[in-house]
Structure formats: C-alpha cells, structure tokens
Design a protein with these regions (language model features):
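Alpha-helical transmembrane segments in multi-pass membrane proteins
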Residues: 16-67
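Juxtamembrane membrane-interface segments at transmembrane alpha-helix termini
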Residues: 36-38, 57-67, 86, 207-215, ...
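Juxtamembrane helix-loop-helix connectors linking adjacent transmembrane helices
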Residues: 69-145, 163-166
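Hydrophobic, aromatic-rich alpha-helical transmembrane segments
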Residues: 11-20, 40-44, 48, 75-87, ...
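Short, Lys/Arg-rich, polar N-terminal cytosolic tail immediately upstream
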Residues: 1-14
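Alpha-helical transmembrane segments of polytopic integral membrane proteins
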Residues: 30, 55, 62-66, 97, ...
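Transmembrane helix-loop-helix hairpins at the membrane interface
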Residues: 130-236
Length: 236
C-alpha cells in the first residue's frame, strides 16, 4: 500500500517544473475542450468526447514522464477487503461532507447560488421519469464517464500536483483539496450549491484514494454507485 505522501509510479528525472508544464497543458485542454459542443449528438456523447480528449492528453504526458495508468491505480486490488472498505468509506464520507456543509452554511448564513441541475436534466439525459428503457440505454455511458473522471481527476491530478510540489505530505493534502475544487468547478462554472456539492464528493474520492492504497477501482465503483442512484432518482 502506498503511503499518503508517496505518489505511485516512476517519474524518472522529471523536474517539478516539467510536471507544472504538464498540468498547464492538461488543465487547459480539460477546460477548453468543453467549449466545443455538437448539439446533434447530445450531452452524454459530448461529455465522453471531452473526457476522451483529455484522456489522450493525459496519456501523452504520462508517457513523457514514464508513468502508466497501472502506476496511478488502474490495477487489480491487492486486497479486495481493503478495496471494499474503501468503497464503503467513500460512499459514507461523501454524504457526510455534504450534510456538514449544509449545516455550516445554515449556521453561518452563507449565500450560494442554488443547484439548478435538476432543471437541466431533461435536456441532458432525456425525460427519465418512468422510462426504464432510456435509463438502461444511457447508464453504461454514465458508468464509462464516471470511470474516466476518476482516471482524470483523481489519478492524474493528484499525482501530478504532488510531483509538481516535490511529493511532500503538504503536497498530498494540497493535491486532494485542489483536485476537489477543480472537479466541482468543472461541473458548474460558479460558486454554487452544485459546484460545492460535487467538490465535496471529489474531496471524499481524493481522501479515499490516498488513504486506501491509491487504487482507482474503489473510487470508480463508488462513483458509478452515486451516479446510478442519482439517475434512479430521476426515473422514480
């Protein structure tokens, strides 16, 4: 099991400046590609196009640094019990963080923009209410997107930020927080209830990643489960 302060892989003699350059390229593509939208193919297909484009850039920079997806955690768990615990931990921590934020925002009278994602759901996914055929048609693509987000937001971002900051414990803490903020902002380009909620889910994923051996499969399982529950709620 990797320690919290030790990113996996062998980056060779690459300098922190090299990883900084990689991050500039990577994040630029991650955000700018979302400006390209083909209305003819719908939101899900566009989302996959964005993620696959970012995946291609990530793979390119990983090869330049001598790092593989297996190094970042896309490998069979060495201990399935730990993997299961990690999945349950994430599924438990994510709602706890969201509830804690809700309580704190009420106590501190914080004002953020409301979550309007439900209003956009029909235009993005179609009318799912009572439509099990539509649900079964799109859920495999939702799972694929969930997997891609874990590779890109946890696997790449956490490890690259750590290496940019020379792999100190502070670097890991900062990386987990930074990727969560980026994850939230990428889903809603504002300081809103949705961006904060998604960011807190990303924080739970990041904590689970570094605390349980840096294997991506528990995160992928948890992410798929959360998105499945969200889609089921729209069906019912």
């Amino acid at each position: 099991m990797s320690t919290i302060g030790s990113p996996t892989g062998n980056p060779g003699h690459s300098s922190p400046q090299a990883f900084f350059t990689d991050l500039v390229i990577y994040l630029s593509v991650m955000f700018l590609v979302r400006e390209v939208y083909f209305s003819e193919i719908g939101f899900i297909a566009n989302g996959l196009m964005w993620s696959l484009t970012t995946l291609a850039v990530a793979t390119w920079r990983m090869r330049a640094r001598g790092v593989s997806w297996k190094d970042l955690g896309l490998r069979r768990p060495t201990n399935y019990k730990v993997a299961l615990i990690a999945t349950v931990f994430i599924l438990g921590l994510a709602p706890v963080l969201v509830v804690l934020f809700s309580v704190m925002s009420d106590q501190l009278a914080l004002v953020v923009a409301p979550d309007n994602s439900a209003e956009r759901a029909v235009s993005r996914f179609g009318d799912l209410r009572g439509n099990w055929l539509l649900f079964l048609t799109i859920i495999p693509f939702i799972w694929l997107e969930s997997m891609l987000e874990e590779l890109l937001d946890r696997g790449v971002l956490i490890n690259w930020i750590e290496r940019m900051l020379s792999n100190k414990l502070f670097a890991t803490i900062f990386a987990v927080i930074a990727q969560a903020a980026i994850f939230g902002f990428r889903h809603s380009h504002d300081l809103s209830e949705r961006s904060i909620t998604v960011g807190l889910i990303g924080l739970a994923m990041g904590i689970g990643y570094v605390a349980f051996g840096r294997n991506l499969w528990p995160l992928i399982a948890a992410h798929c489960a959360l998105n499945t529950l969200s889609m089921l709620d729209r069906v019912n």
